[in-house]
Amino acid sequence: VQAKRDPDFMIIARTDARGVEGLEAAVQRAVAYAEAGADALFPEALESAEEFRTFAHEIQKRGVTVPLIANMTEFGKTPLLSVAEFERLGYRGVLFPVTALRTALQAIDRLLAELKLFGSQRDWLHHMMTRQELYDLLRYKDSHERWEGRTYEHSNE
């Protein structure tokens, strides 16, 4: 924390104590992290909305004012709560670390199975971005204009 030089760099202190030592241990560690200078606190593996509420209340009661961050990882012990629900519980940010990846990989798996079975992607077109949507997302035109006319020649000498 003391070595932090960039004001835009945020140190989010994570505690996994809840799963092993209980909620009170997680609160104690989080308070220590805040006192050491953490910019935000991230309690991992809380098991109910009530635990999230209690954690936030206990942190605040002990004078800690840094933002709280929640983690929404599917198929774990944490219930699937919405961003609005977390906000009502006292959390200022929510991480969805593998939601998009899991969704994309399942779609890829299904597409490949259908390609193997039917040999065509025709029935998947409505699931796909158009070429223009992809270019817009990647800001292709900006990159093309920036690099147009520039070439790189590699020499084996």
PLM regions and their residue ranges:
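Flexible C-terminal active-site loop/helix
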Residues: 115-157
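Alpha/beta enzyme core
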Residues: 1-96, 102, 106-113, 144, ...
